[in-house]
Regions:
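N-proximal low-complexity "stem/linker" segments adjacent to membrane-targeting elements
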Residues: 1-25
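Acidic donor-binding segment of Leloir-type glycosyltransferases
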Residues: 23-62
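Glycine-rich, basic loop-to-helix element that forms the pyrophosphate-binding segment
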Residues: 63-80
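Short aromatic/hydrophobic "clamp" motif used to bind/position activated sugar donors
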Residues: 85
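Conserved donor NDP-sugar-binding/catalytic core segment of glycosyltransferases
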Residues: 97-129
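A recurrent flexible, glycine/aromatic-enriched loop bordering the glycosyltransferase active site
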Residues: 122, 139-157, 179-180, 209
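A short, conserved alpha-helix in the catalytic core of glycosyltransferases
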Residues: 149-157, 161-166, 171-199
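Non-catalytic, C-terminal membrane-associated alpha-helical segments of glycosyltransferases
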Residues: 233-296
Length: 296
């Protein structure tokens, strides 16, 4: 069987109503040479019933437990057959039926292009979600711009990236997995583009809750820094993200979550140290020039 050019990959966890909207936004895509892959991140009867009704239109894998964002995406990568994998969160929708065609044009023009990130629009306000704009200052560029990371729930990735550098780090579960992959991709010579004209509508359904997020940020962001960045940058990342997680924990009444994240971060640092592969000087210079997450 000939492999499709594009695989649309959606990871879902107990959100069938939102998943239905995501799939409906994929179906009108103008590209014919495509497939749709859905990863059910832990058994959910309602979601599975919805997918059964779609029949062979969707390729489905059901994981025996919730493996997190990174583990779920890895399962989707394993099932997908396309040359380009277009990832969409289950509570998001493509806004343009030409999205895949436009993204393919970028990859066809540049053999070293590994990842294209999209602009995420808040479905309630109609404004850009600045927190996932892949630049430190969060300002929107006027056109297609080279970037140092990308929004994982609204992006397209060339399969060769995964073949070359491996999959997402499943141990991260949630938070920091895109940055980890970005640093490895950049260091392997792949380029990342951010195209603000390719947009995704995000409904912001409840995922990892406000009481849980401080744990993952406190644990994961220092790990990613320790694995890839110079030691002075590791110090600023660690202190900065621990402070941020504690502040967020205070606002959410979840200080204990942040403290547990700090505890588990420290406990896991010996393992991360053994995995440490700092990026090259060339990559560090690129991060400094292009608004990358070098110091925080």
């Amino acid at each position: 069987m000939t492999s499709p050019r594009v695989s649309f990959v959606v990871v879902t966890h107990a959100r069938p109503r939102w998943l239905s909207g995501a799939l409906e936004s994929i179906r009108p895509q103008s590209i014919a040479d495509r497939e749709i892959v859905v990863v059910v991140n832990g058994p959910d009867p309602e979601t599975q019933q919805l997918l059964r009704a779609l029949g062979s239109e969707v390729r489905v894998t059901v994981l025996d437990r919730n493996c997190g964002v990174s583990g779920g995406r890895n399962a989707g990568i394993a099932l997908a057959r396309g040359e380009i994998l277009l990832f969409l969160d289950d509570d998001a929708e493509l806004r343009d039926r030409e999205t895949a065609e436009r993204v393919l044009t970028h990859f066809e023009r540049d053999v070293d292009l590994g990842i294209v990130g999209f602009l995420v629009i808040d479905a309630t306000t109609g404004a850009a979600e600045r927190r996932v704009v892949p630049f430190r200052d969060k300002r929107l560029p006027h056109g297609v711009t080279e970037a140092s990371y990308f929004p994982g729930g609204a992006c397209a990735i060339r399969r060769r990236v995964f073949d070359s550098i491996g999959l997402y780090d499943a141990s991260l579960f949630y938070a920091g997995e895109e940055l980890d992959l970005s640093l490895r991709a950049l260091d392997a010579g792949f380029r990342i583009l951010f195209d603000p004209s390719v947009t995704v509508m995000h409904h912001g359904a409840e995922g990892v809750g406000a009481s849980t997020a401080p744990y993952f940020y406190a644990r994961n962001r220092p790990w990613v820094a320790l694995r890839h960045l110079p030691l002075p940058c590791c110090v600023t990342h660690t202190l900065g993200w621990w402070a941020w997680s504690l502040a967020r924990g205070v606002r959410a009444g979840a200080v204990a979550s942040a403290l547990c994240g700090i505890r588990d971060c420290v406990a896991g640092m010996p393992r991360i140290w053994r995995e440490r592969r700092p990026v090259s000087r060339h990559t560090r210079r690129f991060l400094a020039r292009n608004g990358g997450r070098l110091w925080y």
